[in-house]
Structures are given as C-alpha cells and as structure tokens.
Amino acid sequence: MLKDCRDINTELLVAGTILHDIGKLFELDTNEFGASEYTVKGTLMGHAFLGAELAGRVAREEGLNEEDIMLLQHLILSHHGKQEYEAVTVPAIPEALVLHHIDMIDSYMYQFETQAEGLKPGEMSGKVFGLDQRVYRPTWRVPQKKEESEEKK
C-alpha cells in the first residue's frame, strides 16, 4: 500500500518504526522476572524524548545530515500522535502520521488479542476501555495453546 504513496520516505519510516520506542530502554527498569518500574529519568523525560536524544546522538556520530536527523527525531517525538497521548509534538510530515497510526494499530491489536484470549469461543466481552468497544471471539478462531504448537514442531 505504501508504495502507492509517492511522497513517503520509506527509509525514514522504517527507521522511525524501529526506533520509536528505543527510549523505553531508559524509561523502564526491568528485573530478571520481567517486572518493570519507571526510572526517575524515564518519569521526568519520557521514552520519546530519551529515544530522540539517543537517535540524534548516534545519527550525528554516523555522519547523517541535520535535516534527516531532525526528521527522524520528529517521528520519535510525535509517534503518540497527540499531546494528550503524551506526544512531545504532533506529526507534521507524512511519515510521522503513518508511524503514529502503525503504533495505534499495534496497541489496538494487543488490547484486542489480550481481551479475546480470555473469552470462550462464541463469547462477547464487556466494553474494553482502551478500544471503546466490545470484543467477540468467533467459534472458528480457536488459537492453539503455546504448548500444543510447540509439540507439533
């Protein structure tokens, strides 16, 4: 689909997609059991700012030009889409808008799949806050348990 969008810089979009959450490495402190807590730096600055700062520093060391660095940082800083969703700024270029929507689809699908996992086939959930809708698990969509799919390999 994106190949039909003539004005999309796919290299920039792919780089932004890969790096948009890189700041979470510094925002969160995760222990060996997978439990996470926010770091002081992460709480004060947020993962978008920390990621944009890191990406800018590394890109300069690699010799990228300043406009490309600025645009990559813009994707990272604006990937939440709206300031009320904790975006530092709003998308101002097509690649940033596309990245925001990719990130939203990822978030929606995670919520949808997590909700559906707790349902029996043919069952409907209550209203899911983050989706602002209910979720239905079709009778034909019965995902295999992880152990079953591992045994078949």
Regions found by a protein language model. Give the residues of each.
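Divalent metal-dependent catalytic cores for phosphoryl transfer on phosphate-bearing substrates
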Residues: 3-118
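Acidic, carboxylate-rich catalytic segments that either coordinate divalent cations
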Residues: 95-153
